[in-house]
A protein has these predicted regions:
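Conserved AdoMet
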Residues: 2, 39, 43-107
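Non-catalytic accessory regions of SAM-dependent methyltransferases
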Residues: 1-51
Length: 107
């Protein structure tokens, strides 16, 4: 079912909207770097695509490759079903503009 839903997502804008909806409906806890579904979705989608977080507007309508779509779907699904914090999924956390490596041993 999730595969059919994500087959119709083509742009970063599409994936961002999908991620926000999935995070909101799942009731996951925010607090490992963000405090809401939108900010966490921007972080997850942009970082997973290796794009700077502050360039979202430039890439909103950029099309996603099939491999990128699989990767995003996997990360979002793990976030909502396994409740894995985005910081662990991405192996990164931010503090005052500096990126740090994190995993389950850190936070």
């Amino acid at each position: 079912m999730a595969q059919q839903l994500t087959d119709s997502l083509f742009t970063i804008r599409d994936w961002l909207r999908y991620s926000v909806s999935r995070l909101e409906e799942s009731g996951v806890f925010f607090g490992h770097g963000t405090d809401n579904a939108y900010d966490e979705s921007v972080w997850l989608v942009m970082s997973a695509l290796h794009l700077p977080l502050d360039t979202l507007d430039n890439f909103l309508d950029a099309r996603i490759t099939k491999e990128e779509a699989k990767h995003l779907a996997h990360l979002i699904e793990r976030r909502v079903t396994e409740r894995v914090p985005t910081a662990y999924l991405l192996r990164e956390a931010w503090l005052k503009g500096f990126k740090f490596y994190v995993d389950e041993r850190v936070i």
